[in-house]
C-alpha cells in the first residue's frame, strides 16, 4: 500500500500516523476533555512536549469542526454526533493525507449522519485529503462518495463511480432485488419487497 508514493509497510508506526488517520466506528466513552482528545492527534509529532505549533493545529482543527465552545467538556457528556466530530478533529490534527473511517454514521441519527459525512467531504475538498469509508448505507454512500469498491465474499466485485450500482450488483453483493433511480439529480437505491409465500 502506497500513500504519496511511499510504501507504508516500509515506514515506522510514527511515520504512518503522520500520513494516515483513523476514525473508529465507536467513540470511546471517556472523561477526557474535547481539547485533550483532539491533542492526541499530535502524538506522532511530539518529542519532549507540546509545542506552540501543536496548540495551533489543535485550535484550527477544533475551529474547523465548530468545537471551540466545548473544548473543556468531557466526551462522555457529548451526543453521538458531537463525539464523532471530536474524532474527526483529532484525525485532522494529525495532518494526514489519508483518512480511514469505519462506519462513522452507524450510531447516529439522520441529521448527524448527514453532518458527519458532509464535514468529511468538505475536509477532503478543502484540505486536499483522501478518505476511505466503510459504509453500508448505499444511499448515503451515493450522496457523499465519489468512487466505490464493492466486495463479495472477500473479493473485489466492482470498482468505479456510481455507474457500478445496478440491479445485478444489488442482487450479487447484497442479495436483494432492487434498482437505482434518479430523484432531483440524486441516485437512490430502491429495494423491492420480497414476495411472501402464498398460504394455501
Regions found by a protein language model. Give the residues of each.
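Conserved ABC ATPase signature
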Residues: 74-78, 82
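Catalytic Walker B motif of ABC-type/P-loop ATPase nucleotide-binding domains
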Residues: 99-103
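Conserved switch/coupling elements of ABC/ABC-like ATPase nucleotide-binding domains
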Residues: 7, 28, 149, 153-164
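Conserved ABC ATPase "signature" region
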Residues: 52-70, 95
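ABC ATPase NBD Q-loop/coupling interface
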Residues: 1-15
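Hydrophobic anchor residue at the start of the ABC signature
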Residues: 88-89, 116
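ABC ATPase nucleotide-binding domains
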Residues: 167, 173-200
Amino acid at each position: 500500500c502506497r500513500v504519496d508514493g511511499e510504501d507504508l509497510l516500509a515506514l515506522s508506526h510514527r511515520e504512518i500516523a503522520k500520513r494516515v488517520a483513523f476514525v473508529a466506528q465507536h467513540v470511546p466513552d471517556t472523561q477526557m476533555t474535547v481539547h485533550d482528545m483532539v491533542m492526541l492527534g499530535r502524538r506522532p509529532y511530539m518529542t519532549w512536549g507540546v509545542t506552540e505549533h501543536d496548540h495551533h493545529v489543535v485550535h484550527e482543527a477544533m475551529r474547523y469542526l465548530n468545537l471551540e465552545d466545548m473544548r473543556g467538556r468531557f466526551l462522555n457528556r457529548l451526543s453521538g454526533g458531537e463525539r464523532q466530530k471530536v474524532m474527526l478533529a483529532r484525525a485532522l490534527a494529525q495532518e494526514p493525507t489519508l483518512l480511514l473511517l469505519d462506519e462513522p454514521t452507524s450510531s447516529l441519527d439522520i441529521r448527524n449522519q448527514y453532518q458527519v459525512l458532509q464535514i468529511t467531504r468538505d475536509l477532503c475538498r478543502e484540505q486536499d485529503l483522501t478518505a476511505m469509508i466503510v459504509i453500508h448505507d448505499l444511499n448515503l454512500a451515493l450522496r457523499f462518495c465519489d468512487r466505490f469498491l464493492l466486495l463479495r465474499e472477500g473479493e473485489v466485485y466492482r470498482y468505479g463511480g456510481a455507474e457500478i450500482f445496478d440491479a445485478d450488483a444489488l442482487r450479487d453483493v447484497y442479495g436483494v432485488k432492487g434498482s437505482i433511480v434518479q430523484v432531483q439529480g440524486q441516485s437512490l437505491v430502491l429495494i423491492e419487497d420480497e414476495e411472501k409465500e402464498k398460504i394455501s
